[in-house]
Amino acid sequence: MFYVIGGITVSVVAFFFTIKFLFELAARVVSFLQNEDRERRGDRTIYDYVRGNYLDPRSCKVSWDWKDPYEVGHSMAFRVHLFYKNGQPFPAHRPVGLRVHISHVELAVEIPVTQEVLQEPNSNVVKVAFTVRKAGRYEITVKLGGLNVAYSPYYKIFQPGMVVPSKTKIVCHFSTLVLTCGQPHTLQIVPRDEYDNPTNNSMSLRDEHNYTLSIHELGPQEEESTGVSFEKSVTSNRQTFQVFLRLTLHSRGCFHACISYQNQPINNGEFDIIVLSEDEKNIVERNVSTSGVSIYFEAYLYNATNCSSTPWHLPPMHMTSSQRRPSTAVDEEDEDSPSECHTPEKVKKPKKVYCYVSPKQFSVKEFYLKIIPWRLYTFRVCPGTKFSYLGPDPVHKLLTLVVDDGIQPPVELSCKERNILAATFIRSLHKNIGGSETFQDKVNFFQRELRQVHMKRPHSKVTLKVSRHALLESSLKATRNFSISDWSKNFEVVFQDEEALDWGGPRREWFELICKALFDTTNQLFTRFSDNNQALVHPNPNRPAHLRLKMYEFAGRLVGKCLYESSLGGAYKQLVRARFTRSFLAQIIGLRMHYKYFETDDPEFYKSKVCFILNNDMSEMELVFAEEKYNKSGQLDKVVELMTGGAQTPVTNANKIFYLNLLAQYRLASQVKEEVEHFLKGLNELVPENLLAIFDENELELLMCGTGDISVSDFKAHAVVVGGSWHFREKVMRWFWTVVSSLTQEELARLLQFTTGSSQLPPGGFAALCPSFQIIAAPTHSTLPTAHTCFNQLCLPTYDSYEEVHRMLQLAISEGCEGFGML
């Protein structure tokens, strides 16, 4: 009986296995017959299907080289294991139609990948490498011949990296806070990683003790300074990626604070604090809420030419009425001998004055015979006007305040109500700039106010008929009689002899072409300080006679038009296609010239003369306060004195900084004074100068010209690859472009800086680089890349893997821009 039951069981099992085999065989035959794609079927026969001797996506596997979750910024890899249907390894070197697609789920950003077939004994494995910069959830789709590999698509989460102090910021940052004694104030901090991801996975939010706050009082000498009494508590919110620092000070006065993360200052973590009593706070609030009325404070004025507390060491830049800059009523005081700037002693008897603070300006006045007001100094209420807080003055023992706007000499005042005066100014400033000093908040305020300025002017269409062959001349003629209201309208551009209707395309093209016509150096309205076509452009003091000053007014109006159009948003957004010198941008917002502008505007002059003077002893050099000017043939034309009697005043170690600043004033500003004045005249017709004044020169460039995003496709289209073996051209270059495609804009700018010496492209992009961007096959292996910036050459060694290319390129561009040798 036992044998009978066993035989029946074996028969049943054999029957089921036979049925399973027949069903599988039938399925393979049907699959073969239904598959009409000859490319997918290849040379396979029905016998291959019967044996399972074909690549089956569902039999393939994917293995991951990392454990979840993982941080962004690393070179990641996974492996696709290819198998026949019958479970045998499938040789990966055969064409299999493997397609890998990786994208950020929320941002819909595609990630470039590289594929590499491994050698024996893993010849059935394809290694896929990639790098992600943005934290979040990613979808990874792996397909073979259009069919998903088993369990594809996959979903992986990449976490933010560790906190980087230089990327971490205070939300709604102010350079000076006005607080009330004993009342808490909360600062919101957003921790960010190296790639600007808000981070919540590190100890930045788990251990609040990483955030430290140091505060010291401004004014007293170190030996007189006492400890500042304050309370600090730190909490966090993992959902909003924020840290909250709650601060309470218990003593009145002016202080300087610094917030650090792991003993490293965060991005905007340094600021001043004015602490008022409850009564003082009420006075300040009443002062600020009183619109249209100047609040005055009694003070004492010390020697205005005492420049010991400022690094500028430069007399004031004389401004014209068209620029409407702050000026003094007593010109004789502004033109004191420069040597007085080096006299640190105060005058024996300070002058009694009155300081008036209004929503728009801060002025210092003196009263003759106690009834006749005489304005001595006027400063704008804007971020460019800086306050420094010192201790009691030696005469009246009143707290001292130094006011410096970068235009006039610093003014030193002592005042019984110094803290109330400063707090009134700061609160008025905060109202003027929209309540925050962060760049984006200032941009939003600027655009909102600019729209308000032109609100009553209609944005209806006005036709602009121009000739493509004489664009500048025809554009000048078409706008010759335009009023400010006309410039505020929506331009409908019509090119002569062309039938295209302007739905936005011709208008954008006109802006592009007219910017090139005005700011391209070939037209000689603007120039460069060197022959490098990547150099910044500056008004041309030696322009041809036919280029009248009216053209600078037109250029100013065009820039103002672009700013106004951008404030409207959407399709109206229009950037200025130019790269201006820092010194020219500084003059637009009324800043004084400084020798450090040479470093960006005229690098060759900075390296050859400025650095030489800074780094050498001047006692043996026969250098005077004068500049020799040569004509085009190289002959001495004239000698220009940088100050009265400059030709007889030697440059010494003590006054060489003063000399360099005067040299900057002459070369960068005085020579183009008329050009800048006319440019500002046109610009300020459309954009009030008080709105521009809320930005510094770097922010102004971003506002006008944008970030200048670097296009990887443009890079790849115009880069020239020179030399190299098959391995270099087919593998290393493929890895290189994958790495480049994964870089952030900041990293791309560093790569451009590393190779060309400039972090920005000319307006024409990579196509305009001269010489072209070249990638040279270096005769080395596994070393750091090097660069020849004079020739725009990147020397790239050979590497063994994508990970090695990624690591070496990252190391090169992060360490600096001087080029690197072998490790």
UniProtKB/Swiss-Prot annotation:
Look at the named UniProt entry and state the broad enzyme category this protein falls under. transferase
Its recorded name reads: Apoptosis-resistant E3 ubiquitin protein ligase 1
Signal sequence annotation:
none
Q: Name one GO biological process term.
A: protein ubiquitination
Q: Name the active site residues.
A: C790 (glycyl thioester intermediate)
Q: Which organism is it from?
A: Homo sapiens
Read off the InterPro entries from this record: E3_ubiq-protein_ligase, Filamin/ABP280_repeat-like, HECT_dom, Hect_E3_ubiquitin_ligase, Ig-like_fold, Ig_E-set
Subunit info here reads: Interacts with SOCS2. Interacts (via HECT domain) with HTRA2, DIABLO/SMAC and SEPTIN4; in the cytoplasm following induction of apoptosis.
Q: Show me the Filamin repeat boundaries.
A: 52-158
**By its UniProt entry, which SUPFAM superfamilies does this protein fall under?**
E set domains, Hect, E3 ligase catalytic domain
